[in-house]
Regions:
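A metal-dependent, Asp-based hydrolase signature
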Residues: 65-116
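Alpha-helical elements of Rossmann-like donor-binding domains used by nucleotide-donor carbohydrate transfer enzymes
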Residues: 38-42, 65, 91-94, 133, ...
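Short, acidic loop-to-helix structural element flanking the phosphoryl-transfer center
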Residues: 17, 81, 85-86, 106-108, ...
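Asp-based, Mg2+/Mn2+-dependent phosphohydrolase catalytic module
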Residues: 1-21, 33-34, 132, 136-139, ...
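Residues in soluble alpha-helical coiled-coils and helical-bundle/repeat scaffolds
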Residues: 30-34, 53, 104, 122, ...
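Short helix-capping segments at alpha-helix termini
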Residues: 48-55, 98-105, 164-167, 195-196
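Active-site neighborhood of HAD-like aspartate-dependent phosphohydrolases
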Residues: 2-68
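An amphipathic alpha-helix signature
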Residues: 37-45, 85-93, 97, 153
């Protein structure tokens, strides 16, 4: 992947002029993956006592299968094919197969993985480092801040509030604008609520398909949050990714280099 400092070549655009930023929530502002890992590890031991004796590498593989949703069940939820609870149970079933759970314990226990797991994972919700500070700094420049997320608005509103983001009033869920990301509708709804032009609005997210491609199709400025993004001279500033035609940065702190833009 070719990444270039802003203005570093004829193909790299100058840093964008922007009036507002929309963020994805899960795995962009919230470290959901870590919370899912911790909650799965705790809950699977209640599903099957033998989990305590499984090879740690196998347990890690099963945990990642659940968190990364290797079966694509969350997408079926977003499209309306599954309920939220059904997609979670399907992900658990995949993970239990990976774990090698015996047949008599391989059916996910409904209440355990819905009510109980939900309580555990909420206890592990946390923002990525520097997130709260960077959001406050963006707001301090007078720019708008909002969220566009692929889960229902009420659930994500409660999540954001629990993370101390109740002041972020603009939150567009998968059910808010009539279609989920990557459809242009939720991005444009976010811009409308913020009162900003899409071409002067950043969209920061971790998904190339849902966040980057969706934002681009809606006319926003896409910024890909990618932990393995290269840094220019040790600085985690956003770099232009020529292959994907978007800006790319390792962590939210990279936005600080654009606060004066």
């Amino acid at each position: 992947v070719s990444t270039t400092p802003a203005g570093g070549s004829a193909g790299a655009p100058a840093p964008p002029a922007w009036d507002a930023v929309l963020f994805d929530l899960d795995d962009t502002l919230l470290d959901l993956r870590s919370a899912q890992h911790a909650a799965f590890d705790a809950t699977v031991r209640r599903q099957w006592a033998g989990a305590a004796d499984v090879d740690p590498a196998v347990l890690a593989e099963a945990t990642e299968a659940f968190a990364s949703d290797t079966g694509g069940h969350y997408g079926r939820y977003v499209s309306g094919e599954l309920t939220f609870e059904e997609q979670r149970l399907a992900r658990v079933a995949d993970a239990l197969r990976t774990l090698g759970v015996p047949e008599d314990a391989a059916t996910p226990l409904d209440g355990l993985w819905t009510t109980d797991y939900e309580e555990v994972v909420r206890g592990h919700w946390a923002l990525f480092p520097a997130t709260a500070d960077v959001l406050a700094e963006v707001r301090g420049t007078g720019r708008g801040v909002g969220m566009v997320t692929n889960n229902v608005e009420t659930y994500q509103r409660g999540k954001a509030d629990a993370l101390g983001l109740e002041w972020v009033e603009v939150l567009i869920g998968s059910d808010t604008a009539g279609a989920p990301k990557p459809d242009p509708a939720p991005f444009l709804a976010g811009c409308s609520r913020l009162g900003t032009d899409p071409g002067r609005t950043l969209m920061v997210g971790d998904s190339l398909r849902h966040d980057v491609e969706g934002a681009r199709s809606a006319g926003l400025v896409p910024v890909w949050m990618s932990p393995d993004a290269p840094a220019h001279r040790g600085v985690a500033e956003p770099l232009w990714d020529e292959e994907h035609a978007c800006w790319r940065m390792r962590a939210i702190g990279g936005l600080r280099t654009w606060l004066a833009a």
